[in-house]
């Protein structure tokens, strides 16, 4: 596999995907429940949250994998609009992880207990990685859509509308 074919914008998708895959395994939340001197501690990672943990982990990690496979030529660039698919996957993954950052974690408790919940390093770096991947996917999509408009090397870009010929 020749990684020299990977563009710099695609490297952003790959790096962001690697961050999400690695830091999805680490601590996303830690919590401590104190009930009259009895303390219970726990921690969670991406796999404790299906919609806002596992799904974005698969989306962003899969987008990074597809990006590498496309650049290496393992997957053929067919009629599938891969830059758009990768953009959609990374943006959806980033939105879902950011939702998890916002809504936090709420351990089930009843009665008069003290609950302390804190976000872990895994959640923060997964959020950063998903944003990096989404930014790289957006830049790759922009570059590919510009390249498709100017596909003839050496020729002028195609106009957005037809200009009628002038008669002299």
Predicted regions and their residues:
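Compact integral membrane and secretory-pathway proteins
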Residues: 1-168
């Amino acid at each position: 596999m020749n990684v020299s074919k990977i563009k710099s914008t695609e490297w952003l998708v790959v790096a962001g995907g690697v961050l999400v895959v690695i830091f999805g395994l680490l601590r996303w939340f830690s919590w401590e429940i104190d009930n009259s001197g009895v303390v219970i501690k726990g921690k969670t990672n991406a796999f404790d949250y299906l919609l806002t943990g596992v799904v974005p982990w698969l989306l962003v990690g899969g987008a990074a994998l597809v990006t590498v496979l496309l650049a290496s030529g393992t997957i053929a660039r067919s009629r599938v609009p891969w830059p758009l698919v990768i953009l959609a996957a990374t943006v959806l993954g980033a939105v879902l992880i950011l939702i998890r950052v916002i809504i936090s974690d709420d351990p089930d408790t009843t009665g008069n207990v003290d609950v302390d919940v804190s976000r872990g390093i895994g959640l923060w770096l997964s959020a950063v990685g998903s944003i990096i991947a989404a930014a790289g996917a957006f830049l790759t999509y922009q570059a590919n859509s510009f390249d498709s408009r100017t596909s003839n090397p050496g020729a002028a870009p195609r106009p957005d509308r037809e200009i009628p010929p002038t008669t002299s």
